């Protein structure tokens, strides 16, 4: 899988993490049945782990990455460490006190994970847009050099 395709996957999954974490925060504040959180927490954990795997694959290819990809990798990795830490804290809080989540740090932990995942989404989306613009620029420059085809 290409680096760009991996970043596209990270873009999609970081948006899902942000959405899931936000739903968890809202559900915890409304004192809903905590059993409903289990599927969402699994999704959160799986998406965080999946992005971790994608970042590891990108890091293994670091020497062959474009400069923008290296920069995106480094910045995304830093943010995802924070997302993972807050997701893990939320899971630990959930496991320790499911019945009173609204009175624990769970809503704040999930809110923080959501906010940080949203930062990842914004960052990666920006890099992907920049890469697309650069590709279009290169194609245009190439077509100007070649001239009209007859």
Task: Spell out what each predicted region is.
Residues 1-34, 91-150:
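C-terminal amphipathic alpha-helix
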Residues 9-80, 123:
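Alpha-helical segments in soluble extracytoplasmic regions
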Residues 46-49, 86, 95, 142:
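Detector for Asparagine
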Residues 54, 61-120:
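Long, amphipathic, charge-rich alpha-helical segments that form helical bundles/coiled-coils
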């Amino acid at each position: 899988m290409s680096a760009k395709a991996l970043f596209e996957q990270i873009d999609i999954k970081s948006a899902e993490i942000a959405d899931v974490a936000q739903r968890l925060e809202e559900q915890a504040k409304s004192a809903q049945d905590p059993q409903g959180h289990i599927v969402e927490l699994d999704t959160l954990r799986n998406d965080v782990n999946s992005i971790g795997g994608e970042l590891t694959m990108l890091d293994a290819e670091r020497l062959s990455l474009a400069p923008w990809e290296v920069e995106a990798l480094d910045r995304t990795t830093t943010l995802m460490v924070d997302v993972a830490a807050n997701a893990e804290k939320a899971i630990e809080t959930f496991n320790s006190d499911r019945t009173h989540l609204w009175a624990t740090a769970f809503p704040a932990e999930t809110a923080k994970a959501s906010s940080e995942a949203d930062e990842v989404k914004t960052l990666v989306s920006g890099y992907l847009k920049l890469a697309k613009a650069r590709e279009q620029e290169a194609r245009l420059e190439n077509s100007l050099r070649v001239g009209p085809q007859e």
